[in-house]
Regions:
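Structural micro-motif
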Residues: 51-67
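Amphipathic alpha-helical interface surfaces
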Residues: 16, 38-41, 76
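Short, glycine/charged-enriched secondary-structure capping and boundary segments
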Residues: 19-20, 44, 80-81
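Local sequence-structure signature of Cys/Sec-based thiol-disulfide redox active-site neighborhoods
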Residues: 1-30
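Residues that form or immediately flank small-molecule/cofactor binding pockets and catalytic motifs
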Residues: 9, 32-34, 71
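Generic structural signal for secondary-structure transition and capping sites
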Residues: 47-51, 71
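Non-catalytic, surface beta->alpha helical segment in thiol-disulfide oxidoreductase systems
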Residues: 65-81
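Thiol-based oxidoreductase modules, predominantly thioredoxin-like and allied folds used
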Residues: 26-48
């Protein structure tokens, strides 16, 4: 199942969830601002994945972060619509 690390404080995360819901895409949403375990998991992924290079360079957090069932990391949800 698709996993999404995000926060309901983030407009992009809210839009991501709305778009995926409208497209009836199943996913597990992990809030990094409501659950420290999810925050720790996200930070580990962020440190290890090249997908975050541009986000780090721009000073962005890098959410929503999507993890495919195959383990691929992406910061773009449009590919799942």
């Amino acid at each position: 199942m698709l996993k999404i690390y995000g926060s309901d404080l983030c407009p992009d995360c809210i839009r991501c969830k709305a778009d995926l819901d409208a497209a009836r895409v199943s996913y597990e949403y992990l809030s990094i601002t409501e659950d420290l375990r999810s925050m720790k998991e996200f930070l580990k992924i962020r440190e290890e994945s090249a997908a975050f290079y541009a986000a780090k360079e721009n000073g962005s957090i890098g959410i929503p972060c999507l993890i495919s069932p195959e383990g691929e990391v992406s910061l773009s949800w449009e590919q799942y619509l």
